[in-house]
C-alpha cells in the first residue's frame, strides 16, 4: 500500500503486538496482542504516538500524509464490516479513545457512535429495527462529541435531559421514547449551534473523525494531564496514540450488556473474578455510575453461555500477560466482545499479595515480583488509611499537595504549643495542626499532632520534609485557606472552622474533609516481609535512615534500615529544657561563658547519642555537627526574651541588640555549618566529646562494636575541613586517653556546596567518607532556595522548562553530574572512600536508580521511606543485570 519512504503512522490491530507500547500506546498494543491471540475484538486501527508528536511539531495540524493513511484504514474497516462510513442504509460507526504508553487517568474521555448524522441515524434505525436505540445512540454521540471535542460543558445537556424527563413525568433515561429522543437531538443541536457561534453540528463523518483525533492529541497537554505526568515521572514528549474501533452495542435490549471486570480483587489482591455489568447499556454507563450495576456473578444466571466464555477468556488473558487484568467487555445480542484489557491498577496491599501469589502459582519469578511493585506506592501500606465506608460519607472541602502520606482526623489547633499541651493533658487526644507555614521550633507540636495542614509551602517545604521523617500525615500549600491565627479560625470550602472543630486529612491524595473520619491502622503483613526479603537479596546499595530520636531509629530499624546516614544534632537542641542553654551559649560575650553553657548541653547531647547507639545495636551512625545559622535558635516571642534576659542578667534591649546583630540577609549561605566550628571551635569540641563518650560507654555497657562517623557539614575547601578536623581529632584522642579506649572513629564531610564537588579529590585527602546533602547541593547549583522556589516553579512546569520538582527528583543532568564527578574524584585520591546520599532524594525511586549507577555505597532516607528505598535499590540492580 504505502510507497517507499512513506512513514507508517497508522497500524491495523493485527499489525501490532504487546511490545509496541511506545508506538501504539498501552491500549493499542494490548488490542493488537488480543487480536493476535484470537480474542473476540471489534476490529480497528491505531494512530501512533509519533503522529501526536508530529501534530505538536507541526503547529497543531495533522499533515496530509497522516490523514490519507487514516482514511485508507477506514476503507479497510468498511470492507471488514460490510458497512459504509456515513451511509444512510448501513452506516459504519466507530469509537475513538486515547491511549498513552503509560496508563493515565484523566486523559481524554471516550467518544462513542462516531459516524452518525441526521441521515445515517435513519438508516441505522431501519437496519436495526430499533428506532429508540438509534436515536439514543445519536443523542449520546452529540453530547460526547460536543463535550469532549468542542468543550461544550456536559451540564448543558444534562439540564435538557432533566427538563424533558420532568415534562414527560418520567424518572429514568431508559423510559424516554424514540419521539422524546428526537426532541432531545433537536435541542442538543441547538445548544451546539449557540455554543459554537452559529456553526452547525458536523454532518460529515470524515470531519467528525479528524476533529476527534485532534481532540485526543490536545488532551495530552491539558493542565490535568501535565500535573499527572509530573507526579508520576512521565515525560512530556511521549505523546498519546488514538484507537479507532468498530462500535459494538450493549444497549440493544435484554440480551445485550456491558461491564468491567478484574481477574483479581484490586483492593485486596484476592484471586477470583471481581467486577460488575449492566444489561442494556453502553460502556460509559458502568464507569460513569449512572445506573447501579450488578455483580459479575449475576451474569451466570442471566447468560450462562456468555459467562463461561468470559471466564475462560479472562483466565487466558491473565495467563498470557502473567498479571492481574482489568477488562472491558460488551455483549451484543448474546455475542461477547472484549474492548480492552490492561494490567489492572491496584492498591499497594493488593500489589504485594498478587506478586507473591503469582510467584507461588509459578507464573513469575521473585525477581519479576520485585520489579512489579511500584516503590512509591508502598507509602500506602505503612500509614493509616481512612475506612472506605466512612470516607464515602465524608465531605471534601479542599485539596492541596499530598506532602506526607497517611490519613488523620482530629481537632484543629493553630499553634505547636497548643498541640503539645493538649496531647500532654490527654494522651488519647487527636489534633490537627493548622499553620500558615511551620518552622523548626514547631517540631514538638508537629510530633504531637496526628496531621499537619499548611497554607504555604510545597512538597519539599519544612513541614513536608519533617512530617515525612516522622511518618505524620501532611497536606501542604492549601492557598484556598483564609487563616486568622490571632482569632484562631480559618475558612475553606464555604465553611468557617474554629479551634477544637474536627477536620480530616488524606496525605496520600491531598484531600481535606470536614468532620472526623474514622481511620484504620496499617498492618505490615507476611507478604510484605517476603517482598522485602527478596529485595534485600537482589540489591547492592545499602539503605540507611535519617533519624534524630531513638523512637524514629527503632521504627527505621523495624522497617529494615541498616544504620543512620544522617543524625541532625540541632533537632536535639530545640527541646524545651535545652533551648535556653543553647541561647545562653550564643549570647555569651566570652569563650568561658560559652564553654560553661556548652558543658550544660554536653550532658543532654551525650545522653541523646547513648540512646541512639543503644537503639542501633551496633549499626553505624553518621552524626552531622551543628548546621543551621545561630539565629534560628534565638527567641522571637516577647516573654521568651524577658526570661532569657533575667536568666543571663542582661537587659531586654541588650538581648534584642545581640539578636539583631546575628540576623543575616541570606542565612542559607551565611554563618552556618562548619563556619560555626571555625569561629567557635568550642562547639565542635563539645559535640566530639559527646559522641566519643557516648560510643565508648555504650560499648562498655552493652558490648556493641561502634565506629563513630563524624560528619562536618557545608565544607567547600580542604583547609577549612582540616581546621575543624584537627579540633575534632584532638578532643577525640583526649577522650580516648581519659577512658583508656582504643575505639576507631571516622571523620568525613557533607558534599553540599558545588565547589566541594569540583575539588573532591583535594577534600578526600582529609575526609574518610562523603555524604551528599542533595537538598543544599540542589539549592546552590540551581541558585534558588527550596522555600521560595514553590512560588515560581509552577510557571516553569506550565511552560515546560522543568518537568519535575528538582527538590523531589534529583536533577540528573546538572546536580547528578556534580555527584558522579565528586565520587570519581574522591576515589581517585582515596580508593576506599565510602559515599552515600542523605538528602530527601534518598527516598525517591528514580534518584535511587541514579545513585546505583553513580556507584554510591548507600542511600539514606526518612524512616517510613526505608522500604521504598529497599525496593527501588533492588529494582535498580535488577534493571542493571537485565541490560
Regions found by a protein language model. Give the residues of each.
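Nucleotide/phosphate-binding sheet-loop regions of phosphoryl- and nucleotidyl-transfer enzymes
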Residues: 2-394, 429-432, 439-444, 450, ...
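Glycine-rich phosphate/ribose-binding loops and adjacent secondary-structure elements
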Residues: 335-337, 439-447, 451-453, 459-466, ...
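Protease-associated
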Residues: 363-448, 512-517, 528, 532-536, ...
Amino acid at each position: 500500500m504505502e510507497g517507499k519512504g512513506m512513514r507508517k503512522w497508522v497500524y491495523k490491530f493485527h499489525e501490532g503486538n504487546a511490545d509496541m507500547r511506545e508506538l501504539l500506546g498501552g491500549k493499542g498494543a494490548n488490542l493488537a496482542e488480543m487480536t493476535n491471540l484470537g480474542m473476540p475484538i471489534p476490529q480497528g486501527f491505531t494512530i501512533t504516538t509519533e503522529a501526536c508528536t508530529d501534530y505538536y511539531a507541526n503547529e497543531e495540524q495533522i499533515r496530509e500524509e497522516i490523514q490519507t493513511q487514516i482514511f485508507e484504514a477506514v476503507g479497510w474497516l468498511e470492507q471488514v464490516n460490510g458497512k459504509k462510513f456515513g451511509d444512510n442504509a448501513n452506516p459504519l460507526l466507530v469509537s475513538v479513545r486515547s491511549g498513552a504508553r503509560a496508563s493515565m487517568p484523566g486523559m481524554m474521555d471516550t467518544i462513542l457512535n462516531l459516524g452518525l448524522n441526521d441521515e445515517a441515524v435513519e438508516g441505522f434505525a431501519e437496519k436495526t429495527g430499533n428506532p429508540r436505540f438509534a436515536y439514543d445512540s445519536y443523542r449520546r454521540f452529540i453530547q460526547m462529541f460536543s463535550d469532549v471535542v468542542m468543550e461544550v460543558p456536559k451540564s448543558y445537556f444534562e439540564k435538557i435531559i432533566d427538563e424533558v424527563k420532568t415534562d414527560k413525568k418520567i424518572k429514568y433515561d431508559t423510559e424516554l421514547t424514540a419521539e422524546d429522543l428526537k426532541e432531545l437531538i433537536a435541542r442538543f443541536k441547538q445548544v451546539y449551534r449557540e455554543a459554537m457561534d452559529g456553526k452547525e453540528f458536523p454532518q460529515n463523518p470524515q470531519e467528525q473523525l479528524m476533529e476527534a483525533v485532534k481532540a485526543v492529541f490536545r488532551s495530552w497537554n491539558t493542565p490535568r494531564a501535565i500535573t499527572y505526568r509530573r507526579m508520576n515521572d512521565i515525560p512530556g514528549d511521549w505523546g498519546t496514540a488514538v484507537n479507532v474501533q468498530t462500535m459494538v452495542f450493549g444497549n440493544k435490549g435484554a440480551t445485550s450488556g456491558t461491564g468491567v471486570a478484574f481477574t483479581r480483587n484490586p483492593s485486596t489482591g484476592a484471586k477470583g473474578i471481581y467486577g460488575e455489568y449492566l444489561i442494556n447499556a453502553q460502556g460509559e454507563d458502568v464507569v460513569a455510575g449512572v445506573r447501579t450495576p450488578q455483580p459479575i456473578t449475576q451474569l451466570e444466571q442471566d447468560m450462562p453461555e456468555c459467562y463461561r466464555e468470559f471466564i475462560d477468556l479472562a483466565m487466558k488473558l491473565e495467563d498470557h500477560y502473567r498479571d492481574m487484568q482489568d477488562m472491558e467487555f460488551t455483549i451484543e445480542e448474546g455475542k461477547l466482545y472484549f474492548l480492552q484489557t490492561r494490567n489492572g491498577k491496584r492498591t499497594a496491599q493488593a500489589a504485594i499479595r498478587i506478586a507473591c501469589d503469582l510467584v507461588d502459582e509459578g507464573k513469575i519469578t521473585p525477581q519479576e515480583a520485585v520489579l512489579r511493585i511500584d516503590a512509591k506506592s508502598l507509602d500506602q501500606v505503612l500509614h493509616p488509611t481512612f475506612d472506605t465506608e466512612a470516607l464515602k460519607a465524608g465531605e471534601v472541602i479542599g485539596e492541596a499537595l499530598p506532602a506526607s502520606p497517611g490519613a488523620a482526623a482530629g481537632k484543629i489547633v493553630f499553634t505547636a504549643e497548643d498541640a503539645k499541651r493538649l496531647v500532654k493533658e490527654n494522651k488519647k487526644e487527636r489534633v490537627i495542626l493548622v499553620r500558615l507555614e511551620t518552622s523548626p521550633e514547631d517540631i514538638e507540636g508537629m510530633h504531637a499532632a496526628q496531621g499537619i495542614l499548611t497554607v504555604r509551602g510545597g512538597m519539599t517545604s519544612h513541614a513536608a520534609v519533617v512530617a515525612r521523617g516522622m511518618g505524620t500525615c501532611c497536606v501542604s500549600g492549601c492557598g484556598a485557606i483564609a487563616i486568622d491565627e490571632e482569632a484562631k479560625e480559618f475558612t475553606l470550602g464555604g465553611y468557617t472552622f474554629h479551634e477544637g472543630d474536627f477536620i480530616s486529612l488524606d496525605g496520600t491524595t491531598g484531600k481535606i474533609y470536614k468532620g472526623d473520619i474514622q481511620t484504620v491502622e496499617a498492618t505490615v503483613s507476611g507478604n510484605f516481609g517476603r517482598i522485602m526479603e527478596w529485595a534485600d537479596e537482589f540489591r547492592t546499595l545499602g539503605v540507611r535512615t535519617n533519624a534524630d530520636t531513638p523512637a524514629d531509629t527503632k521504627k527505621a530499624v523495624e522497617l529494615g534500615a541498616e544504620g543512620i546516614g544522617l543524625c541532625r544534632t540541632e533537632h536535639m537542641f530545640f527541646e524545651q529544657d535545652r533551648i535556653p542553654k543553647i541561647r545562653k551559649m550564643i549570647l555569651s560575650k566570652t569563650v568561658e561563658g560559652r564553654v560553661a553553657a556548652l558543658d550544660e548541653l554536653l550532658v543532654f547531647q551525650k545522653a541523646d547519642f547513648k540512646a541512639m547507639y543503644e537503639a542501633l545495636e551496633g549499626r553505624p551512625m553518621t552524626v552531622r555537627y551543628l548546621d543551621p545559622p545561630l539565629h534560628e535558635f534565638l527567641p522571637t516571642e516577647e516573654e521568651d526574651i524577658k526570661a532569657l534576659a533575667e536568666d543571663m542578667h542582661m537587659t531586654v534591649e541588650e538581648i534584642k541588640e545581640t539578636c539583631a546583630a546575628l540576623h543575616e540577609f541570606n542565612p542559607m549561605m551565611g554563618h552556618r555549618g562548619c563556619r560555626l566550628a571555625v569561629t567557635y571551635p568550642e562547639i565542635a569540641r563539645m559535640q566530639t566529646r559527646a559522641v566519643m563518650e557516648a560510643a565508648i560507654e555504650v560499648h562498655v555497657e552493652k558490648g556493641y562494636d561502634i565506629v563513630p562517623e563524624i560528619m562536618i557539614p557545608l565544607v567547600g575547601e580542604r583547609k577549612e575541613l582540616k581546621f575543624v578536623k584537627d579540633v575534632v581529632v584532638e578532643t577525640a584522642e583526649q577522650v580516648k586517653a581519659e577512658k583508656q579506649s582504643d575505639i576507631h572513629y571516622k571523620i568525613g564531610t557533607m558534599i553540599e556546596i558545588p565547589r566541594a564537588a569540583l575539588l573532591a579529590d583535594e577534600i578526600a585527602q582529609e575526609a574518610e567518607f562523603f555524604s551528599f546533602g542533595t537538598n543544599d547541593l540542589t539549592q546552590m547549583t540551581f541558585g534558588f532556595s527550596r522555600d521560595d522556589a514553590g512560588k515560581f516553579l509552577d510557571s516553569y512546569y506550565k511552560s515546560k522548562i522543568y518537568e519535575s520538582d528538582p527538590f523531589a527528583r534529583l536533577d540528573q543532568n546538572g546536580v547528578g553530574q556534580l555527584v558522579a564527578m565528586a565520587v570519581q574524584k574522591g576515589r581517585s585520591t582515596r580508593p576506599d572512600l565510602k559515599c552515600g546520599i542523605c538528602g530527601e532524594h534518598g527516598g525517591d525511586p528514580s534518584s535511587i536508580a541514579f545513585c546505583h549507577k553513580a556507584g554510591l555505597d548507600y542511600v539514606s532516607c526518612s524512616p517510613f521511606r526505608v522500604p521504598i528505598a529497599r525496593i527501588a535499590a533492588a529494582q535498580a540492580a535488577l534493571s542493571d543485570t537485565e541490560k
